[in-house]
């Protein structure tokens, strides 16, 4: 299966992502769901590869910065980023000589897929976070992930150790035909976006997502302000217009999380507890505090700070 490769040119590391869709990756293996994977393999991915080779690659940082100022939070709302990516691919696909039918099919796919950029934002976040690993004495979180059973975090100075606790339920809104009783516990790798200060951290600049995850614009702004209390800095490159163009909060510090009892806020999709279903809704969730307490305890043990 084709993947995108995202390279951090400053540090030379890479991350990758698959096609994002709302059916098979949530456990729906119907023929209809699999058809999108087949079209990705045979039509859409080859067309996009031709375009990217035509222009020698595409810089994602400008797209991300613009999208954040256009109402995206780059986790469950990537409408602007997906459109900007589609615009960037249109002419190069034509210049690369992509056959007309494949060109039209790929453009139609991009135009109708508002969540397309999520895979690229996840890979960008991963490529951004990985160079922060292995820094002595650092208590900055470098990964957050969930598997429907456990929620785990990794911390810079503790390198590849995982600190896990039971995965929490997600509070949110459900698509027609589904309810709380159908939902599994929090799961997925997409919280890597919050790890670098996107997603729930920038809800204040993405009020459009509230119709999907629930909440009010005032609450969204309060989440973005609250995240500043548990992070080490703000981004000089990614800014939120609704907060006076302040930079996004970045660098979750396990010490601050434990000291304040403020947990990172994550907006996330809801998966069914049983296989055979597409996405069933979306909402907000916070990691278990126990993850951060375990990490801080290990940190003090490692560096003899008891």
Feature-to-residue mapping (PLM):
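Anaerobic metallocofactor- and corrinoid-dependent redox/one-carbon enzyme cores
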Residues: 1-306
């Amino acid at each position: 299966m084709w993947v995108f490769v995202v390279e951090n040119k400053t540090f030379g590391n890479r991350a990758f992502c698959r096609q994002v869709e709302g059916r098979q990756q949530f456990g729906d293996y119907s023929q209809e769901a699999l058809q999108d994977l087949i079209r990705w393999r045979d039509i859409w991915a080859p067309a996009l590869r031709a375009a990217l080779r035509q222009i020698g690659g595409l810089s994602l940082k400008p797209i991300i910065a613009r999208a954040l100022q256009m109402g995206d939070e780059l986790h469950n709302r990537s409408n602007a980023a997906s459109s900007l990516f589609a615009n960037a691919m249109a002419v190069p696909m034509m210049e690369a000589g992509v056959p007309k039918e494949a060109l039209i099919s790929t453009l139609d796919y991009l135009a109708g897929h508002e969540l397309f950029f999520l895979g690229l934002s996840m890979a960008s976040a991963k490529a951004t976070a990985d160079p922060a690993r292995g820094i002595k004495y650092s208590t900055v979180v470098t990964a957050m992930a969930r598997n429907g059973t456990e929620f785990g975090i990794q911390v810079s100075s503790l390198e590849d150790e995982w600190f896990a606790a039971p995965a929490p339920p997600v509070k949110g809104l459900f698509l027609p035909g589904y309810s709380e009783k159908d939902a599994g516990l929090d799961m997925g790798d997409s919280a890597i976006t919050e790890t670098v200060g996107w997603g729930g951290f920038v809800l204040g600049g993405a009020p459009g997502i509230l119709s999907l995850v629930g909440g009010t614009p005032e609450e969204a702004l309060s989440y973005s302000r609250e995240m500043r209390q548990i992070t080490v800095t703000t981004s000089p490159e990614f800014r939120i217009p609704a907060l006076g163009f302040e930079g996004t909060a970045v660098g979750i510090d396990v010490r601050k999380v434990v000291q304040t009892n403020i947990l990172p806020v994550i907006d996330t999709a809801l998966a069914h507890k049983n296989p055979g279903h597409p996405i069933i809704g979306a909402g907000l969730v916070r990691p278990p505090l126990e993850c951060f307490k375990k990490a801080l305890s290990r940190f003090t043990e490692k560096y003899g700070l008891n």
